[in-house]
Amino acid sequence: MKVTDVRLRKIQTDGRMKALVSITLDEAFVIHDLRVIEGNSGLFVAMPSKRTPDGEFRDIAHPINSDMRQEIQDAVMKVYDETDEVVPDKNATSEDSEEA
């Protein structure tokens, strides 16, 4: 399985989230709402998640092996590094990261 497309929108915010991302796998399956987060050790790609009733976050979709996780990380960060446009936080929603 290969990452065949990355749609990324950098956002301007005071928080740790730096971009919203959608990826396409094998030109056949899209995953929305990945995020680029600034962590203590640098930028990383966080999988889409939702908050449970007890306040914890659980991934909705995620790779099950380290090779796929690394491929997603590499593909997203390549596009992140190549993207100059940043939108204000008020415009950064999940809908903005969907394909037009």
Swiss-Prot record:
A GO BP entry: division septum assembly
Disulfide-bond pairs as recorded: none
Name of this chain's protein: Putative septation protein SpoVG
Gene name as annotated: spoVG
Purpose of the protein: Could be involved in septation.
Protein family according to the UniProt entry: Belongs to the SpoVG family.
Source organism (scientific name): Staphylococcus aureus (strain N315)
Assigned keywords, A-Z: Cell cycle, Cell division, Septation
Other comment: Expressed more highly under biofilm conditions after 24 hours of growth.
A Pfam family the protein falls into: SpoVG
